[in-house]
From Swiss-Prot:
Catalyzes the initial step of the lipid cycle reactions in the biosynthesis of the cell wall peptidoglycan: transfers peptidoglycan precursor phospho-MurNAc-pentapeptide from UDP-MurNAc-pentapeptide onto the lipid carrier undecaprenyl phosphate, yielding undecaprenyl-pyrophosphoryl-MurNAc-pentapeptide, known as lipid I. Signal peptide: none annotated. Coiled coil: none annotated. The gene is mraY. This is Phospho-N-acetylmuramoyl-pentapeptide-transferase. It is a multi-pass membrane protein. It catalyses: UDP-N-acetyl-alpha-D-muramoyl-L-alanyl-gamma-D-glutamyl-meso-2,6-diaminopimeloyl-D-alanyl-D-alanine + di-trans,octa-cis-undecaprenyl phosphate = di-trans,octa-cis-undecaprenyl diphospho-N-acetyl-alpha-D-muramoyl-L-alanyl-D-glutamyl-meso-2,6-diaminopimeloyl-D-alanyl-D-alanine + UMP. One of its GO terms (cellular component) is plasma membrane. The lineage of its organism: Bacteria, Pseudomonadati, Pseudomonadota, Gammaproteobacteria, Cellvibrionales. The chain crosses the membrane at residues 25-45, 74-94, 97-117, 134-154, 168-188, 199-219, 236-256, 263-283, 288-308, 339-359. Belongs to the glycosyltransferase 4 family. MraY subfamily. GO terms for biological process: cell division; cell wall organization; peptidoglycan biosynthetic process; regulation of cell shape. Keywords: Cell cycle, Cell division, Cell inner membrane, Cell membrane, Cell shape, Cell wall biogenesis/degradation, Magnesium, Membrane, Metal-binding, Peptidoglycan synthesis, Transferase, Transmembrane, Transmembrane helix. It is found in: Cell inner membrane.
Length: 360
């Protein structure tokens, strides 16, 4: 919105030309989303408390979590609101990537909202039935995959690139659609599984989004892409504005979500953020790098899969409790220690992911 307005006004005042720079708009996107989150956060928490939208805590989980019962949840709506407002203010409306990411993020957020609402307002512990949850996730995931496949303007947009290797790209054909679907839906649910401790999911999401913002900027710039031997995706740079909005909104939310949390993001936030990260990684052709940078999300998901498989096959559990962050809690680690150590691991993995841009 402001991008187009500035484009019009620069004919009369040359100073508005500064808003044509992607880096300027990305920085403003961070600050705008951060400001919105910090300003609206207290009001959102107060409203959720008044509406009795409180988190229900499992009785079979760590006993230290019982004190969290009743903490306002569905705070992910605050993150999404700040993200969307900031993105719409500073991005180029004519960019197809911006719209597909916004729409998919909104759909996954809506699925999470319904799931949270049924759990909290309707007192239904199961929330939205799993079949319906995955049905709507699949609709959005496949829809995005088909759209990107059909609108691809260059072979690189549907090729699979292998990190650490120069000029290694695999033509996927129609398999691109299936692959994209699994990246989007898989990342969405992986972030959701990670969201079990105060600030545990949001900070890694912020770190990964920040890295993806840089990658999107480089992938959308022909000279940088050529120099780094990464896929050049025309228009992908505009996703840096979206990713920066996620960073700002996430940091603002963390202000209230840090231990001890005043609000939880709920499925409305976790599912949406995961889908957004997965889709951006697909567009900029860095799915494997996302797998590296989001290693904590992968670890949490694998721990659940192994736990379920082991119990069904042998009747024994590998971990004291899954996802794995609960395992460490039951071993005696204080919650803040688990959180910060997982953050540190994510920071290291993000740096490794960014290193793949140069080490080829």
């Amino acid at each position: 919105m402001l991008y187009w307005l500035a484009e019009y006004l620069q004919e009369y005042m040359r100073g508005f030309a500064v808003f044509q720079y992607l880096t300027v708009r990305a920085i403003l996107s961070v600050l705008t989303a951060l400001g919105i989150s910090l300003l609206l956060g207290p009001w959102v928490i107060r409203r959720l408390t008044e509406m009795r939208i409180g988190q229900a805590v499992r009785s079979d989980g760590p006993q230290t979590h019982l004190s969290k019962s009743g903490t306002p949840t569905m705070g992910g709506a605050l993150i999404l609101s700040a993200m969307f407002i900031s993105t719409l203010l500073w991005s180029d409306f004519g960019n197809r990537y911006v719209w597909v990411v916004l729409i998919v993020t909104a759909i996954f957020g809506a699925v999470g909202w319904v799931d949270d609402y049924r759990k909290v307002a309707k007192r239904d512990p199961k929330g939205l039935p799993a079949r319906w949850k995955y049905f709507w996730q699949s609709i959005a995931g496949f829809g995005a995959a088909v759209f990107l496949f059909c609108t691809a303007q260059a072979p690189a947009e549907t090729q699979l690139f292998i990190p650490f290797f120069k000029n290694v790209a695999l033509n996927m054909g129609l398999f691109y659609i299936i692959f994209t679907y699994f990246v989007i839906v898989g990342t969405s649910n992986a972030v959701n599984l990670t969201d079990g401790l105060d600030g545990l999911a949001i900070m890694p999401s912020v770190m990964v989004a920040g890295a993806l913002a840089l990658i999107a900027y480089l992938a959308g710039h022909s000279q940088f892409a050529q120099y780094l031997h990464i896929a050049y995706i025309p228009g992908a740079g505009e996703l840096a504005v979206f990713c920066c909005a996620l960073v700002g909104a996430g940091l603002g939310f963390l202000w209230f979500n840090t231990y001890p949390a005043q609000v939880f993001m709920g499925d409305v936030g976790a599912l949406a953020l995961g889908a957004a990260l997965g889709l951006v990684a697909v567009i900029v052709r860095h799915e494997f790098v996302l797998f590296i940078m989001g290693g904590i999300f992968v670890l949490e998901t694998v721990s659940v899969i192994l736990q379920v498989a082991s119990f069904k096959l042998t009747g024994r559990r590998i971990f004291r409790m899954a996802p794995i962050h609960h395992h460490f809690e039951l071993k005696g680690w204080p919650e803040p220690r688990v959180i910060v150590r997982f953050w540190i691991i994510t920071l290291v993995l993000v740096l490794i992911g960014l290193a793949t841009l140069k080490f080829r």
